[in-house]
Amino acid sequence: MKALKNLSLILLLVLTFTGCHDKSSKLADFNRAVYTPEYASGFDIKGADGKKSVLVTVTNPWQGADSITTYLFIARDGESVPEDFTGQVLGKDAEHIICMSSTHIAMLDAIDEDRCVVGVSGIDYISNPDIQARRDSVGDVGYEGNINYELLLSLDPDLVLLYGVNGASSMEGKLKELNIPFMYVGDYLEESPLGKAEWLVLAAELCDLRAAGADTLQRIARDYQALKAHPAPDAPRPKVMPNTPYRDTWFMPSSRSFMIRLIEDAGGEYVYTKNDSDTSVAVDLEEAYLL
């Protein structure tokens, strides 16, 4: 009788242990918004009831993208990845990140996490003081089309932050082959400066610092709105032409881009109002000179 009682107790403990650690889930479970952007339109973060893991969705992450959606699942607390998930998987909070754009570094710097950056593209063109101080240990993996994958692999990244210009990054295939997760950052496609800035919250999510990212964004938004509210001087608005020519061509941003909104909020006037698409357009030097 005593042996039977002990066996029953053991079985009960086993069932309890198994029940507490059964963390399997389905992708459809991740439908609860844990962060809904206020200014940005290119990403969202969802969770599931009783789960610490999150699902990051990035939409149309390059110019001209139409109905393109990419996913990153961040697995936390030993929780399993949904069996029906086919996107990128970050198996833990990111500690080693490779940034293919300097703006990615700025996002991490805004939450004091630029120490996570172990690799960059074009270190000589990066002004971040911490990166320059660590340039002997931060790897310069090169540029798209000429990536040093041997160096990239040696940096043991948890995640690579990519961007696309007019299509998917050429690094995708090789990163998949090397089993290195990646995520697109489409901040430059936002239509407002605060929308662009809000991507820092997503960068913070990668490090499990969502609250810190949201607090930082609120401070930035408050300061931005205060500056925007300053009365404009009683003078004509200065005309502004962004960028510089490249091979006798001037690329004019969309009048709906964050850059043009920034110029207007600062009291300037964009000289090229013909482009209301979602991409930059090429203008020859003669036309640019006449603007």
Regions found by a protein language model. Give the residues of each.
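A short, structured surface patch at a secondary-structure boundary
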Residues: 54-57, 62-153, 159-165
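C-terminal motif of bacterial Sec signal peptides marking the signal peptidase cleavage site
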Residues: 15-19
